[in-house]
Amino acid sequence: MARFFRRRKFCRFTAEGVKEIDYKDVEVLKGYITETGKIVPSRITGTKARYQRQLATAIKRARYLALLPYTDRHDD
């Protein structure tokens, strides 16, 4: 069996000391969305539960205000 080196997951928001995630910070939010527009789960990103809830709310607000797309593409 081959062993793989797995990078340790850590919460970026805890490390940076973020109090609240801002829905207007689109560049940060884009890092937590897949190509299809889905929110990436915390088990993959390593985000703590508190920040994952804030992240989901911020992404939904940004989508509602058209700062982020709901989906990446609409195939015709």
Swiss-Prot record:
Keywords: Ribonucleoprotein, Ribosomal protein, RNA-binding, rRNA-binding. Pfam families: Ribosomal_S18. Transmembrane segments: none annotated. GO terms for cellular component: cytosolic small ribosomal subunit. One of its GO terms (molecular function) is small ribosomal subunit rRNA binding. It comes from the Bacteria. One of its GO terms (biological process) is translation. The keyword RNA-binding applies. The keyword Glycoprotein does not apply. Binds as a heterodimer with protein bS6 to the central domain of the 16S rRNA, where it helps stabilize the platform of the 30S subunit. HAMAP family: Ribosomal_bS18 (MF_00270). This is Small ribosomal subunit protein bS18. It comes from Hahella chejuensis (strain KCTC 2396). The gene is rpsR.
